[in-house]
Amino acid sequence: MSTPSFVDAFSQQFTLDPARTALLIIDMQNATGNRHMGLGQLLAEQGNSDSAQYRFDRIEQLLIPNIQKLIEGFRTAGASIIWITYGANARDASDAPPHIAPIIKATNNIAGQPEHEVVDALKPGPDDLVLNKTTQGAFRSTALDSALRA
């Protein structure tokens, strides 16, 4: 008798009901997920781009390809996709908590700005819901709870 692999030992089969399942894609924006904009640009201007190379490599080589696979699967199954963006709606970031507003301003993560947009490799579809949070929690500053219960 063979010993199951670690993955097999902790994996369970399950079925998702597309009518009751949503894929949440959170904070995949240029402000923090693009090495040439927002945080990436800020770190480069500060001479610290090397400190974030691992971060952006992982986003580009691991995170984005896997999110693309999930999007394809959820769209094929007819399940909902909800995008949660993060940033200020007000140009002066006055709608963001005081401890978060400085980084929002420094990365230009303001609604309507290119930095606030979802990274080019991942774009919401016409039937996807996009909710913007102005705090760190999507349930606190968006209609996510209502959308999931609908």
Put a short name on every predicted segment.
Residues A111-A150:
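Internal catalytic-core helix/loop-beta-alpha segment
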Residues M1-P124:
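Active-site acidic carboxylates
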